[in-house]
From Swiss-Prot:
This is Uncharacterized protein TP_1000.
Length: 223
């Protein structure tokens, strides 16, 4: 897809954060009750995930590691669209949590369970980078594949009441290497190349999107 291509129009209802059947939490209820704030109506995010992205192990019989989890990397597509569904920006992205070992090992569920689940989410634009490179964004008000709620702060609340993780849109830049890593390593985040993140931010700048503003997003899975 190139800028200017047209995709089917999605109504506002398609982008609304939704409750998964039979799943609810205090954090989820609070987020729904607060409603939407600073939501842009003119630009949206559309992520297309391909099933092959779940086959990230080079050898399916071996355990998760940097040596084994780089297969089928960045096979998914991220797009920004205007209200008419025209594509303003597109890039390949890693959306499946292939960094699911060591200190990033999930506490429960499947190995890639920290991946954002198909459905609606909300992007908060230009959040504090902290240890990350460049200008990054937060993924909020959605579910992961283990059925846990990602709240308005792009975090989860553990059963003990602690905040865990931060779901972001960031690049694969390594300060140690002084360049992008060869592969994108996601612990649940959407990971782009540094050049593609820069291009996306240029589009958001042109559209006047400012720090803290939000846009609706939807993640679809393709065969």
């Amino acid at each position: 897809m190139q800028a200017g291509d047209t995709l089917p129009f999605y109504s506002n209802a398609d982008y609304q954060p939704h409750r998964r059947k039979g799943v609810c939490s205090a954090a989820h209820r609070a987020d729904v009750q607060r409603g939407e704030t600073m939501m842009r109506e003119d630009v949206r995010m559309h992520v297309l995930r391909r099933r092959i992205s779940f086959h990230y192990r080079v050898d399916p019989l071996k355990g998760d590691s940097f040596e084994n989890n780089w297969a089928n990397n960045s096979c998914d597509t991220m797009q920004l669209q205007d209200k008419a569904g025209r594509v303003l920006y597109g890039a390949m992205v890693q959306t499946v949590a292939n960094y699911c070992f060591g200190r990033m090992a999930p506490g429960s569920g499947v190995a890639h369970g920290e991946s954002v689940a198909p459905g609606a989410f909300v992007v908060r634009c230009f959040v504090p980078a902290r240890a990350f490179h460049g200008r990054i964004h937060a993924i909020t008000r959605t579910w992961d594949m283990d059925g846990e709620w990602i709240d308005r702060e792009a975090m989860q609340i553990s059963t003990e009441g602690y905040q865990t993780g931060r779901w972001l849109i960031h690049d694969r830049w390594s300060e140690k290497l002084g360049r992008d890593t060869n592969y994108a390593w996601s612990a649940g985040c959407f990971v782009l190349s540094s050049e593609d993140l820069r291009r996306m931010n240029e589009v958001l700048d042109r559209w006047g999107v400012s720090c803290g503003q939000e846009m609706a997003g939807i993640l679809e899975e393709l065969e």
